[in-house]
């Protein structure tokens, strides 16, 4: 179902024209009494809402929310924050800062040099 650019352009132009016509009708009929367009829009919104309510995924979400026992329980677990300072996972024998970890190699290069 591939559409060419010309087909898409024509579709966009027709949608733009329809949208402009709807805007003009709404501006003319903004006196406060409901029009056929507003009634049709309300029906469409209600139908979409009903379909969402009947969806299995909505029922599953509602069940999961009902199973939630207290405010501390989370449905989706949060990622634990890692500390900003991570120890090296490979041997860096006394290289760098002491806080970053070291295996204690006595022949390692140390900075700043010690006498």
Curated annotation (Swiss-Prot):
Pfam families tied to this protein: Cauli_DNA-bind
Molecular-function annotations in GO: DNA binding
Entry keywords, A to Z: Coiled coil, Disulfide bond, Host cell junction, Virion
Recorded coiled-coil stretches: 1-28, 33-54
Gene3D superfamilies given in the database record: 6.10.250.630
Chain residue ranges for the region called Disordered: 96-115
Matches recorded under InterPro entries: Caulimo_virion-assoc
Main location: virion
Location in the cell: Virion; Host cell junction, Host plasmodesma
Comp. bias intervals (Polar residues): 96-106
A GO-annotated cellular component: virion component
Assembly notes: Homotetramer, through coiled-coil domain. Homotrimer when interacts with icosehadral capsid. Interacts with capsid protein, and with Movement protein.
Function as written in the Swiss-Prot or TrEMBL entry: Plays a role in virus cell-to-cell and plant-to-plant transmission. Interacts with virion icosahedral capsid and movement protein, thereby facilitating virion cell-to-cell transmission through plasmodesmata opened by viral movement protein. Also interacts with aphid transmission factor, attaching the virion to aphid stylet when the animal feeds on an virus infected plant. Aphid saliva may later detach the virion, inducing release of infectious particles when the animal feeds on a new plant.
Family assignment from sequence similarity: Belongs to the caulimovirus ORF III family.
Protein's recorded name: Virion-associated protein
Organism, scientific name: Figwort mosaic virus (strain DxS)
